[in-house]
Amino acid sequence: MSFTSNFQKQIFIYLVCCFLFTANYSFSQKSEVKADETSKAKKWYDNINIRGYAQIRYNKLFETNSNLGCEQCDKSWGGTNSFFIRRGRIVFSGDVHERVYIYVQPDFASAAGTTNMIFQIRDAYFDLSLDSKKEYRFRFGQSKVPYGFENMQSSQNRLALDRNDALNSAVSNERDLGVFFYWAPKNKRELFSKLVNTGLKGSGDYGIFGIGFYNGQTANRPEANNNQHLAARISY
């Protein structure tokens, strides 16, 4: 009788120990999972992407007219110019919120005239999406004016060395300060991105329909006459 009682006590103690060990192990596992989830939770700045590019030119090759110049065009034309940093840009972009996208692009090779090289902001804007699919969005800040096709293309993707003067002269530097509205279905926005990312010379994601107001003074210049310009664009 005594042997049976002791044996039952031992079995009971063994089962209790197993239960406590299992419960402790399960709690430890859950704590580790929660700790991992906390440590892997992304901050808003983790979504910021940094990239850039530079373009260097030499325009003396096959030159026939050293007096040819164009303040609105390539500043390395004519005169004593030879090697020239046409563009030197760094891009900071990303979704800082589920409905807010930012894009900032400074240019370290901008020319104020025929000689001086200065730092200049090319793009500084944010997109505010009105829906979760980001099909309807407003763009606030300095950005490209939705006008033409070549004007919208990035210099990284364009086939020609420069944009044609006929269209580019309408919006020098392609950019201005304003507010624009863009609309495109989600699948079309994905298509716009695919055309650029696969090297098919797309114009970028400026919506199926775009419309907005801008100062009309070109980039990095304040409003001078309180007379905003209107631009609209439809693509298919």
What are these regions (language model features)?
Residues 41-62, 77-216, 224-231, 235-236:
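Outer membrane beta-barrel
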Residues 3, 7, 15, 19-69, ...:
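N-terminal periplasmic/intermembrane-space "pro-region" immediately following the signal or transit peptide
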Residues 1-5, 169, 222:
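A general boundary/transition motif marking the beginning of the first structured unit of a protein
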